[in-house]
Regions:
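A generic structural signal for short coil/turn motifs at secondary-structure boundaries
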Residues: 20-23, 62-63, 150-154
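"Short basic amphipathic alpha-helical interaction patches in structured regions
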Residues: 8, 23-31, 67-70, 128
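Conserved structural elements of the adenylate-forming
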Residues: 24-45
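Short loop/turn segments at strand-loop or loop-helix junctions that form parts
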Residues: 11-14, 55-58, 118, 142-147
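Conserved adenylation A10 loop of the ANL superfamily
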Residues: 6-23
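Active-site glycine/GP-rich loop and adjacent strand/helix microenvironment
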Residues: 75-240
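Conserved AMP-binding loop of ANL adenylate-forming enzymes
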Residues: 41-75
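Flexible, low-complexity linker/hinge segments
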Residues: 1-6, 36-39
């Protein structure tokens, strides 16, 4: 696309510290990302916007032109919320007064909670456990993704994560999702049985790491991610 048509520049450092890649978005691609994400999320929360708590700091969305996968996630999911509140102060500690006020205000409603997995774990779950605090959020739905490598280093798997979340909040409606900044909008969301699902707008193929031929179900290999969204950059097919 022409430089004048670029409305957003997204950056990704990769999962293993590779050099930063830049993804340039024009208005059409940015719009498609939102439309597709909205279609996917409607299957889980309906079309009505919910009161929303983000387990992060407000400063994460300060730069609207250049932002990371974390920023893109917060901005993308926040369109499904209303009266959006941030749970953490700038020093990454829980603002209990703000959080309790939010929960009390919407105690009779369904609440949408969003955050990145490792941030939720380190700065919300562990902190609540440390101070012995619990919330009754049984009517809430939690979406989270990213940061699993850091949790695996602490021997925390998906089951342990969900159990500990449930213990401090009574949340049972928890959905992990997989996405990458190179294909923002094309997320794969975990169902209630623990399986990730491809939407009508994306797909994935497991390929042999030597021959690159497609593998049978249940096999391990390289992941080829496919998406119909990108218009302003070559992100339709990515091998990861």
């Amino acid at each position: 696309v022409e430089k004048k048509d670029i409305v957003k520049t997204m950056t990704s450092s990769g999962t293993s510290g590779q050099s930063v890649s830049k993804i340039f978005l024009d208005k059409e691609t940015a719009s498609l990302q939102i439309k597709v994400l909205s279609k996917i999320m409607a299957d889980f929360i309906g079309k009505k916007r919910l009161p929303m708590l983000i387990i992060d700091t407000k400063s994460i969305i300060s730069n609207r032109e250049k932002f990371s996968a974390r920023t893109a996630g917060v901005l993308g999911f926040s369109i499904f919320g209303r009266d959006v509140e941030f749970a953490l102060d700038e020093d990454m500690t829980i603002n209990f007064k703000r959080v309790e006020s939010f929960f009390n205000k919407y105690k009779s409603e369904n609440i949408l909670i969003f955050g990145f997995t490792f941030i939720i774990w380190k700065h919300f779950v562990l902190e609540l456990e440390k101070v012995g605090r619990k919330f009754n959020l049984s009517k809430s739905v939690l979406f989270h993704g990213g940061g699993w490598k850091q949790l695996e280093n602490q021997s925390v798997d998906n089951i342990e994560f969900k159990n500990r979340i449930s213990n401090i909040s009574n949340i049972s409606n928890i959905h992990n999702y997989y996405g990458m900044v190179e294909q923002t909008g094309s997320i794969f969301v975990e169902c209630e049985h623990g399986f990730f699902h491809a939407s009508s707008f994306s797909d994935l193929i497991i390929r042999n790491h030597q021959t690159h031929s497609s593998e049978l179900n249940g096999s391990q290999g390289l992941i080829q991610l496919l998406s119909v969204i990108p218009k302003s950059y070559p992100g339709h097919s990515i091998l990861t």
